[in-house]
Amino acid sequence: MGVTQVGVNTSFNLVKKIILLVVFSLTLVLLFFYKNHNNKSHIQIGGDFELTNHLGQKTTNDSFNGYHRLVFFGFTNCPDFCPNTLNNIGIVINQIDKKDQLVPIFITVDPERDTVAKLKKYLTNFHPKIIGLTGTNEQIKSVKTKYKIFSKKVMDTKKENGKSNNHNDGRDHGCYGVDHTTIIYLMDKKGVYITHFSPDTNNTDMVKKINQYL
């Protein structure tokens, strides 16, 4: 009888240990997935910057506090994609419900050519709410890093009679274009990343998505 009781106790203890081990393992798995999900929901895009707007005023991330932002990187010598995107952003601004709560921001990836004066002149072609930002090479490099933006100069080797054949105006600092990331970011009122739009997102979908957050 005593032997049987010992056997029962041993089996019970074994089952208890197995249950505790399973519970512990499940806890670790749940913690892993929670941490993973938490990291994904707080994507580190954006942050502090110090640049100059197209009116010559010092501008930081805090300058836009209280407003959602649409942030797009490009350059004024861009032949078609940048102007098309800026035109589309203007259309979106006109169609959203609370347009006074959203600021569209255009940050250059070509600070050598995109001076304050050039940005100001360029932006007269687009929606008046769009704010252009430029800065030194180091300032632009810093803000590109924070927004996960890639850009690279592409030299124009096709020339006729000493003039560039590409669509970029290379008169200022040589003949080159700039390959760059073409994502449009939607940031919240504190400059925290919400979502982004790819180049092929149509205006209707953008308006619908933006209205969800304003």
Predicted segment positions?
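Short loop/turn microsegments at loop-to-beta-strand junctions
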Residues: 46-47, 69, 181-183
